[in-house]
């Protein structure tokens, strides 16, 4: 009706069309306004529902996070401010808001933050991710028991299987304990027998504590200190803590000291136990925890006055053991063959861990495995081969934690193969390992005090080591261990436990350090396993000949200075004495080169080219001066990586040597020892360097007999020059850096010297009245007679 009425009006009035058009527009506008209003209402409702869901999610997340934090002994989170809070609240939490916005963009629910007590910043999301994994470690169930024992006892023993989490979690709980005490905050030290473990564990714990490595958490190894004044938890090699004790005998900066991997019974750990046992008596506020991965803890308990024991079981799965029916003639060949067979034939996923004895063997195996897998063609699964040994740089050590390659489309399994020294036995845990290949060998230090020879020999491992290796296969699920030796050999030929290092080492450095610590009565020092008296006497004799101890066995001023250098006594003496021969710069460089891994690279496929490259650096007088030539050439070529590659030189070794040299230079500066050089054009330039070498190594000399072989001076051991020497002739008298026991007796890193220097520089040692009869004695007698008759006024 109204519609017709309006239309009628339109027909009656001339302006009706215009008015009808305007009314239509109004109606459209009203409808649009109404639609927009409805959309806004719907949007508001949807937003309200989403906010409610977000609040519910946040509440659930906070509840689960709080449960996790409370179980971890940390304070629960408080409710976060909403996005629509007041301006002042917004500004107060600007850091958190910005972080939440970022998290929102990333598609994550905003997590309420609690403040990191070490940085005073909110914890990062990664902290909570890591915390969830930490709480799953077996050790967490024992936190309350651990804290109770820590509070009530000054020292105790903790046994936890590899992978239980003891190395990463226990030190953090000790930090919490130290922070809860009133008064000045002392730090926590955790010693490791191996540098790789000290570095990689420190990095992991820094991540877990949400701090920068080198700040609140740091590490200290020989020639490298990654810590600061802020460091409250320091991982270090056992030798470094012993060195700290020389300048701080009561270790006052620490409130808790943890000796980790004590079952390895390294030389430094054994000495530290004796030192700490005495320190604990003088410092009632010091806590000492001895941690071991094996169950023979009774000996440690008895040693520390029947202290308590806390045992933490690991989470291990069954491991199937396979033996070879017959002994393997070439264990390296057998190991490589086993890796290939497992990779090709095993149908279940899982990574491999192969134990070998040293860097050269590991590098060789990695190359050969890669080459053989590449030759198998594209149908075989991808393989990622990762070496692991102590001299690898930290970033390369971290590769062991990388995931394996993915499966191929044809279903072929990708695997990670870690080829490691015995560091992977207990020091580091590598998740994902299901197959272990154990050839049954490791390099061990062996010392013969009668002939004063210490060597690294490839020897059979103990049953305890074999069990630890097998256990690596059962960390995440049931595994398999392939032992490349017979079951009979395991049962009848292997020792039960590894022989403590103190019973098979040259104790020169140890005795020097103990003397520096003020421990003079070595016979009554509380060793857990006392070394043989002959070994101790040899060490005292060496230090007396080097003038580090006087005839009464007391530390001399020179000996006190030598103890400050992180070097063997012979090297330390050589560095200090080089100042008297105007060649301390050059001797510093040689010492640095001797302190790092072999600098010459000799790949199997390019041995001839590598040998030719080495001879370009060769010095006519021998290997020490050849090392000096390499270092000088490296510096002159601006430390170029390409130059190293072209000349078959290990770049990492040279960079390490440069770092070592700088540290030794700083120690020299501290004692005001002049750093100088003889003029290069002088004929005495190389003579002075060779004389300086004699000041440290006059006890390591060999004489060429008429029969054509060398005899070591005094000890009369038949030896040969090592094939790696650059000497192209046989000098009558040579000084050597090390005695190598293999199929033959070799002397390695040799330099041509003059016999006159020996009797002039070390007359006490070259006293002919107690020298055995030999060609060398007869010749030295003649030289001494000539010197005494003034025929030689110069030498």
Swiss-Prot record:
The keyword RNA-binding applies. Residues 20-62 have a biased composition (Basic and acidic residues). The modification Phosphoserine is found at residue 15. Gene3D superfamilies: 1.20.120.1080, P-loop containing nucleotide triphosphate hydrolases. InterPro entries: DEAD-box_helicase_OB_fold, DEAD/DEAH_box_helicase_dom, DHX15_DEXHc, DNA/RNA_helicase_DEAH_CS, HA2_WH, Helicase-assoc_dom, Helicase_ATP-bd, Helicase_C-like. Changing residue 540 to E: Abolished interaction with NKRF. Residues 338-518 form the Helicase C-terminal domain. Changing residue 260 to A: Abolished ATPase activity without affecting ability to activate the MAVS-dependent signaling to produce interferon-beta. The modification N6-acetyllysine is found at residue 488. It is found in: Nucleus; Nucleus, Nucleolus. It is an enzyme of class 3 (hydrolase). ATP binds at residues 160-167. Residues 1-108 are annotated as: Disordered. One of its GO terms (molecular function) is double-stranded RNA binding. Its main location: nucleus. Keywords: Acetylation, ATP-binding, Helicase, Hydrolase, Immunity, Innate immunity, Isopeptide bond, mRNA processing, mRNA splicing, Nucleotide-binding, Nucleus, Phosphoprotein, RNA-binding, Ubl conjugation. One of its GO terms (biological process) is response to alkaloid. There is a cross-link at residue 786 (Glycyl lysine isopeptide (Lys-Gly) (interchain with G-Cter in SUMO2)). Belongs to the DEAD box helicase family. DEAH subfamily. DDX15/PRP43 sub-subfamily. This is ATP-dependent RNA helicase DHX15. It comes from Homo sapiens. The gene is DHX15.
